[in-house]
């Protein structure tokens, strides 16, 4: 898995991500749908910044990722914040998700579901998350659509500065 190679650099490389805005949006959606507490899963949690924000907001979290190295970084952060007792980390492929119980909701951000592949795999991943969802549960996820490469990326120039 490619993410194993740079797990300890991921946060630095992803440094421009606005986790505060993402958290505010997700927390607002969870509250609006009656999921103000309980167990949530962060599917494709990576190094867990959002996972930890939700833990600190009072949720019991399950962080799921394929990369043991990403989970190791998350584990270190949770230990530093003193929230490890409210966090279960599972190294799993979300196509074969097994949470061993029900959840009130799930989140999956930063285009995790874009990496799943063709529609049958996507449908399977959604079905696995839904299988563990309590009645009335909420699943919040993001996807890139043709809009982004056509309108956002095409309208910008990207480059790298050399040494």
Predicted feature locations:
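Class I SAM-dependent methyltransferase SAM/SAH-binding core
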Residues: 41, 49-96
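A short glycine-rich, Lys/Arg-flanked "PGG" loop and its adjoining helix->strand segment in the class I
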Residues: 123-135
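A short His-aromatic
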Residues: 114-116
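Residues lining the SAM
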Residues: 109-111
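Conserved class I S-adenosyl-L-methionine
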Residues: 1-44, 138-163
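A short acidic, Gly/Pro-enriched loop at the edge of an enzyme's catalytic core
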Residues: 98-105
């Amino acid at each position: 898995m490619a993410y194993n190679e740079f797990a300890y650099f991921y946060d630095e490389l992803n440094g421009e991500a606005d986790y505060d805005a993402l958290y505010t949006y997700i927390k607002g959606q969870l509250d609006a749908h009656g999921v103000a507490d309980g167990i949530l899963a962060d599917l494709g949690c990576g190094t867990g910044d959002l996972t930890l924000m939700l833990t600190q907001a009072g949720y019991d979290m399950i962080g799921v990722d394929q990369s043991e190295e990403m989970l190791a970084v998350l584990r270190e952060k949770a230990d530093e914040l003193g929230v490890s007792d409210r966090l279960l980390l599972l190294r799993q492929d979300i196509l074969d998700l097994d949470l061993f119980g029900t959840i009130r909701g799930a989140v999956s951000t930063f285009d995790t579901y874009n990496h799943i592949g063709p529609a049958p795999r996507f449908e399977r991943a959604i079905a696995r998350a839904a299988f563990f969802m309590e009645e009335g549960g909420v699943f919040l996820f993001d996807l890139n659509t043709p809009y982004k490469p056509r309108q956002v990326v095409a309208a910008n120039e990207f480059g790298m500065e050399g040494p």
